[in-house]
């Protein structure tokens, strides 16, 4: 089980990313637009640098929904490999069966 503080910190980051995403994307578009004057583009870069770091998408860590485990994460199920295996073996994931050949 992951530390509760780590899980909560990640939730706060997700919320902040959702709030900051439109403004951040607009500033990035201005900074990348080669048709604009360099001064305007540079100002957009400075404003982007002033924004909170936790508003950046790359700061989010994928974690298991049940345990909070940060590693061995399956995106499709939003679970870690350990939790996925436990739930699959007890038949709690619809359509998932143990393979045999």
UniProtKB/Swiss-Prot annotation:
The entry's keywords: Ribonucleoprotein, Ribosomal protein, RNA-binding, rRNA-binding
One GO cellular component term: small ribosomal subunit
Domain of life: Bacteria
UniProt-listed InterPro entries: Ribosomal_uS14 (IPR001209), Ribosomal_uS14_bac/plastid (IPR023036), Ribosomal_uS14_CS (IPR018271)
Pfam family, one: Ribosomal_S14
A GO MF term: rRNA binding
PROSITE patterns hit by this protein: RIBOSOMAL_S14 (PS00527)
Region described as Disordered: spans on this chain: 1-23
Keyword check for Ribosomal protein: yes
A Gene Ontology BP annotation from the UniProt entry: translation
Protein family: Belongs to the universal ribosomal protein uS14 family.
Its biological purpose: Binds 16S rRNA, required for the assembly of 30S particles and may also be responsible for determining the conformation of the 16S rRNA at the A site.
Subunit structure: Part of the 30S ribosomal subunit. Contacts proteins S3 and S10.
Protein name, UniProt field: Small ribosomal subunit protein uS14
Organism classification: Bacteria, Pseudomonadati, Pseudomonadota, Alphaproteobacteria, Rhodospirillales
């Amino acid at each position: 089980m992951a530390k509760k503080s780590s899980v909560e910190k990640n939730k706060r980051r997700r919320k902040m990313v959702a709030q900051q995403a439109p403004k951040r994307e607009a500033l990035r578009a201005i900074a990348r637009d080669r048709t604009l004057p360099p001064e305007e583009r540079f100002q957009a870069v400075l404003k982007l640098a002033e924004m909170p770091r936790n508003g950046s998408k790359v700061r989010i860590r994928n974690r298991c929904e049940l345990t909070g485990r940060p590693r061995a994460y399956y995106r499709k199920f939003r679970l870690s490999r350990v939790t996925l295996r436990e739930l699959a073996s007890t038949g709690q994931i619809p359509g998932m069966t143990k393979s045999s050949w």
